């Protein structure tokens, strides 16, 4: 379900994105710009994500899993209100976290992050993340995972709910349909962005 790109505002400014999509669950929305310069220069993937937490004290998160279409291995960005203000942190969602053996703690991730920003209005949480893309990569296919939870304690997000809306979402989006692509590129022309909800 495509959405208009003209009504996206972040930090008081209108933002232009090549693509926008309403996700199938949790009233979440994602918009992105994929900028590929040439074969020898790094490109960028700019991602705007907005979701609604179950409560003002809750969290919203999304991430990319470089290893497959699954929750375990997701390199995540989770945002919430903290005592020091609106916060967005990185989390490596390991198999131990998925299994409930280990808590979800802020950790470095494998993605090359250029910048992160967040704005929160009540329970609505918007994030803006810019990632750097390696020019030697042979595919621009990524797996996107998202979810939300009702509370955060000591900067550790609590587990999300287990309703059907929390557990079931799957779609595919062609990142390159409206991307800024050079005339000569090694990137796959049929790359897909796959989305799946975040089941703990």
Task: State the predicted function of each range.
Residues 1-199:
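Extracellular-facing/secreted segment signature in eukaryotic proteins
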């Amino acid at each position: 379900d495509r959405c208009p790109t003209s009504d996206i505002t972040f930090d008081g400014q209108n933002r232009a994105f090549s693509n926008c999509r309403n996700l199938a669950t949790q009233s979440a929305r994602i918009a992105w710009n994929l900028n590929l310069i040439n074969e020898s220069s790094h490109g960028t993937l700019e991602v705007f994500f907005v979701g609604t937490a179950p409560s003002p004290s809750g969290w919203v998160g999304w991430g990319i899993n470089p290893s497959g279409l699954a929750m375990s291995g997701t390199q995540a960005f989770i945002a919430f209100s903290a005592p020091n203000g609106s916060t967005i942190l990185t989390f490596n969602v390991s198999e131990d976290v998925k299994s409930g053996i280990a808590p979800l703690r802020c950790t470095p991730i494998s993605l090359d992050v250029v910048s992160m920003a967040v704005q929160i209005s009540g329970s609505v949480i918007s994030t803006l993340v810019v990632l750097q893309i390696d020019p030697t990569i042979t595919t621009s296919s990524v797996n996107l995972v998202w979810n939300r939870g009702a509370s955060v304690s000591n900067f550790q997000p609590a587990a999300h709910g287990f309703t059907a809306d929390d557990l079931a979402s799957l779609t595919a989006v062609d990142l390159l349909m409206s991307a800024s692509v050079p005339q000569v590129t090694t990137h796959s022309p049929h790359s897909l962005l796959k989305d799946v909800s975040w089941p703990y």
